[in-house]
From Swiss-Prot:
Gene3D superfamilies: ribosome modulation factor like domain. GO terms for cellular component: cytoplasm. It comes from the Bacteria. One of its GO terms (biological process) is regulation of translation. This is Ribosome modulation factor. Keywords: Cytoplasm, Translation regulation. Belongs to the ribosome modulation factor family. It is found in: Cytoplasm. The keyword Cytoplasm applies. During stationary phase, converts 70S ribosomes to an inactive dimeric form (100S ribosomes). The keyword Phosphoprotein does not apply.
């Protein structure tokens, strides 16, 4: 099994970050597990903050990729 599939919390965070950078609604978090949903929302908030601070989606993608390593 690949490492990225094992760590659900980190994966949820990165997906939330990317959704936030894309300007998507936080209502899109469809995580059933409470902690994974919280990680997604944390990533979403940081993604929105970075978007508001002027990071481009490309910069945000590099930042999100550094989280997953």
């Amino acid at each position: 099994m690949k490492k990225q599939k094992r760590d659900l919390h980190q994966r949820a965070y990165v997906k939330g970050y990317r959704a936030g950078m894309a300007g998507r609604s936080k209502a899109l978090s469809e995580r059933c597990h409470t902690q994974a949903r919280q990680d997604w929302l944390t990533g979403w908030r940081e993604g929105r903050e970075d978007m508001w601070n002027g990071l481009t989606p490309v910069d945000g993608t590099y930042k999100a990729a550094s989280f997953s390593q």
